[in-house]
Amino acid sequence: MGWLVADIGGTNTRCAIAKPGGAVENIEAFRNREFPGLDRLLAAYLGALPPRERPEEAVIAIAAPIRGDEIRMVNINWTFSVSALARTLSLKRVIPLNDFAAQAYALPVLGSHDLCQVGGGQAVDRAPRVVVGPGTGLGTAGLVRVAGRWHAITGEGGHVTMAPSDEREARIVALGRERFGHCSAERLISGAGLAFLYGALNAGIVLTPAEVGTRIEAGETAALEALDVFFQLLGTVASNLALTFAAFGGVYIGGGITPRYVEQFQASGFRTRFEDKGRYRPFLADIPTWVITADQPALRGLAAYAEANA
């Protein structure tokens, strides 16, 4: 019968049915703002399925810390109980995972056609891996192999304090502290962060993330500069994670922004910044970095998790 799998972001939710063997079917996307809560959104998806295809269990990925039965999402005003959600949807079990745990569990099932390597390095089989991805927020996770199985290590790495690497970034971070109090990595490396960077580099011009995206697509010099700074900052965070995990299995860049701009990412200062760690430059030069170009990697990761924990 399969599992309900759902990737619940701050803006959109994608639902599907995971079949035995890891196949993902019946993928549907929803705008979160069109529903008062997650229960109504998932009920809409399940209600459209033929009764014989309705699953009895679910694995859901959530863009929020998971510290118990009650979950409070960060980038949308949704709070819910996992046990109550299962009862409301008539499911025997609902397993919540951090959204980037789902991304991490996808890494072992991605093929070369799902990835675009940027820079050098060769992955070491079964070594730790890292995934980081800017979108509505900035997600991070590690993946380590213990006793023959992969285990995701999640946290809130997007909220670490952003450290500047040059005078221009120092000015940007100072503006971030003025605006937000604490200038975390997510304040600069996310959709809203890209818009903030554009304003910081252009006399405070206020644009939405979508408007900055339009200017990037049009080839505007100022927008492309903001994107390059964005990718360099991402390089700083990615290399910090690579050092923390000794991620010789590779660093994978996901999220909704980078895969949209692969050409600009390849030409950016990301990899130079990634390796720019002084005495540890040779260490990082050996670690490969990839952009995840696969469709729905989180759903594939949830399917892999469901298969392993059926």
What residues fall within each predicted segment?
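ATP-binding/phosphotransfer module of carbohydrate and carboxylate kinases, centering on a glycine-rich
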Residues: 1-50, 54, 168-310
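Short, acidic Gly/Pro/Ser/Thr-rich loop/turn segments
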Residues: 13, 65-67, 137-141, 196, ...
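ATP-dependent carbohydrate kinase catalytic cores
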Residues: 93-124, 209-228, 236
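Short, glycine/charged-enriched secondary-structure capping and boundary segments
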Residues: 19-20, 73-76, 110-112, 145-148, ...
